[in-house]
UniProtKB/Swiss-Prot annotation:
InterPro entries: SBP_5 (IPR039424), SBP_5_dom (IPR000914), SgrR_HTH_N (IPR025370), Tscrpt_reg_SgrR (IPR023767), WH_DNA-bd_sf (IPR036390). This is HTH-type transcriptional regulator SgrR. It comes from the Bacteria. Signal peptide: none annotated. Residues 1-116 form the HTH marR-type domain. It holds the Pfam family SBP_bac_5. CDD domains: PBP2_SgrR_like. Residues 163-493 are annotated as: Solute-binding. Residues 26-49 bind DNA. The gene is sgrR.
Length: 552
């Protein structure tokens, strides 16, 4: 019998007997474990051989045998839990232990660095699974970061300074205002072993032509080997940066025929997905990566939903150590939580409603009514970026007849729930009921259901001149809620003629967008890690981080 199954049987037997020595029979024990008398004898002999118990059998009618436990079920359960942790079988660990608080402590104690069979392993604790990693679809902040570790694109944007770097394309040039040429590296391989071909690149870029920022691409062809021409309908100074974004990452041309591609994608990036379950995401360094091979061999993201109840935890790489020493990387996000008024509903479009609601739900009001741990993480927002002060909150009078408002946000985000509760209480003081809708992220991103106001958080990446407009423009919800000439704005942005500060100020002037709070992004640990630099998404580039090897 496998060791794990035998351990489970012993724990069950120990629990049924309360761990006490007793006189019993094979039949009675077999009934307890729902097995045959013969199988029960085999179990007892095997457990005795392991030193877990003694079984003093008595032969004869009416005779009772003595069962003595030498090992406690709790001790064996702990040993079994340790084995499951080492094997990264978190789902079985949760079933074994049952108590989520105990599971959490076990996970935290095993976070951080592990050195096994010459391989460096990093374990991270996170609060939700990441089922969808498919570029070009609605991806949240963390999925966006993970996708960048799995896939490559023609270009790459440096996370630290926003500068453009070579990736699949080693050089590029603008042939004319409407034609860009990219020169691709040969010999690149996908994680499943096949060599990258030009058709993979062309099909990947063609599939995203329906997205607003890529809709001006009219033709993609290859005039010579490993040369790619991209034809545009209007000039775009940002095209090389655009082709370094997650939607433009390169997929195998027949990706739709590959099983579970969204959760187990195949790219050409520094890490390949090995496992993606509700309890764990495991990615391994790709030995045939065309760039510098990652120094951390394996990254395990352990999922424990209950930690979402503690918004201050941030990204946890290592548990507490003796003496209370803390190793924390933090930064104020380039972005904010904000309210979005929906012009498609009468209440959402009403200027007086916008003015009054933004007054009642002002950043200072939210901060004042938040719990102390959150007050330390929140900073009042008066613009989309921390350095901007575009919002001009007025006194505002409550519109006559306003009795209810509908607020919508997406699931699995504890701070959205906290903010919504505070908003509900503040509005209730004015006899306004806040109806709250919590929906899937895909639904939220599409913005096709009815809501007066929407709650969102935006994290802008470097360079901000690129990402601020690109991020807002690529979310269908915003285009649905804010009636304006988005195509005209995009043309102006592509031409480099947009004053982004003025453009954002326009959105805030009519209260289409109301900034609420800036949030401190936090990474707890890792004391022994080198090269860890937090990016604007609250994560760090796995392939650039490393551990000093253990002492010989």
């Amino acid at each position: 019998m496998p060791s794990g199954r035998l351990q489970q049987q012993f724990i069950r037997l120990w629990q049924c007997c309360d761990g006490k020595t007793q006189d019993t029979t094979l039949n009675e024990l077999a009934d307890l474990l729902n097995c045959s008398r013969r199988h029960m004898r085999t179990l007892l002999n095997t457990m005795q051989a392991r030193g877990w118990l003694t079984w003093e059998a008595e032969v004869g009618r009416g005779k009772r045998s003595r069962l003595t436990f030498l090992y406690t079920g709790l001790a064996l359960q702990q040993q079994r839990a340790e084995d499951l942790l080492e094997q990264d079988r978190i789902d079985q660990l949760v079933q074994l232990v049952g108590d989520k608080s105990a599971v959490r402590q076990m996970l935290i104690s095993h976070l951080g660095r592990s050195f096994r069979q010459g391989r460096h392993i990093l374990r991270v604790l996170y609060y939700r699974p990441m089922h969808n990693l498919l570029p070009g679809t609605a991806l949240r902040r963390s999925e966006t970061h993970i996708a960048r570790q799995i896939f490559s694109s023609l270009t790459r944007v440096n996370e630290e300074n926003g500068e453009l770097e070579a990736d699949i394309a080693h050089h590029w040039q603008q042939i004319s205002p409407l034609l860009w040429r990219f020169y691709l590296r040969p010999g690149i391989h996908f994680h499943h072993g096949r060599e990258l071909e030009m058709e993979d690149v062309i099909s990947s870029l063609t599939r995203i032509n329906t997205l607003p920022l890529y809709s001006h691409i009219t033709k993609i062809d290859s005039p010579t080997a490993w040369t790619l021409d991209i034809h545009l309908s209007q000039p775009d100074r940002w095209l090389p940066w655009l082709l370094g974004q997650v939607p433009a990452m390169i997929l195998p041309r027949k990706w739709e025929t590959l099983a579970n591609f969204a959760s187990h994608p195949i790219g050409t990036g520094p890490y390949a997905v090995r496992r993606n379950t509700p309890n764990q995401l495991k990615i391994l360094a790709f030995d045939d990566y065309f760039g510098y091979r990652a120094l951390i061999d394996e990254v395990n993201v352990w999922v424990l939903p209950d930690i979402s109840e503690e918004p201050a935890c941030g990204l946890m790489l290592e548990g507490p150590i003796q003496g209370g020493e803390k190793a924390i990387e933090s930064r104020l996000e380039e972005g904010c939580y904000y309210l979005l008024f929906d012009a498609r509903t009468p209440r959402g479009a009403h200027p007086q409603v916008r003015e009054w609601v933004s007054h009642v739900l002002s950043p200072t009001n939210l901060l004042y009514h938040a719990d102390e741990p959150l007050q330390q993480l929140w900073f009042p927002a008066y613009g989309l970026l921390p350095r901007w002060h575009h919002a001009r909150p007025g006194p505002g009078e409550k519109p006559a007849g306003l009795e209810t408002l509908t607020l919508t946000f997406y699931r699995e985000h504890i701070e959205h729930r906290v903010i919504a509760r505070i908003m509900s209480a503040l509005l209730a003081e004015h006899q306004v009921h806040l109806h709250i809708q919590e929906i899937d992220y895909d639904q939220w991103h599409a913005g096709e259901i009815e809501s007066d106001i929407w709650l969102n958080s935006a994290n802008f990446t470097l360079p901000l001149d690129f990402s601020l407009f690109a991020h807002l423009c690529e979310v269908p919800l915003l285009q649905n809620c804010i009636p304006r000439d988005w195509q005209g704005d995009a043309a102006q942005w592509r031409a480099g003629e947009m004053n982004l500060a003025n453009w954002c100020q326009q959105l805030l002037a009519n209260k289409a967008i109301v900034p609420l709070i800036h949030h401190w992004l936090i990474i707890q640990g890792q004391r022994s890690m080198r090269g860890l630099r937090m990016n604007t998404l609250g994560w760090f580039d796995f392939k650039s981080a490393w551990f000093a090897p253990p002492d010989p």
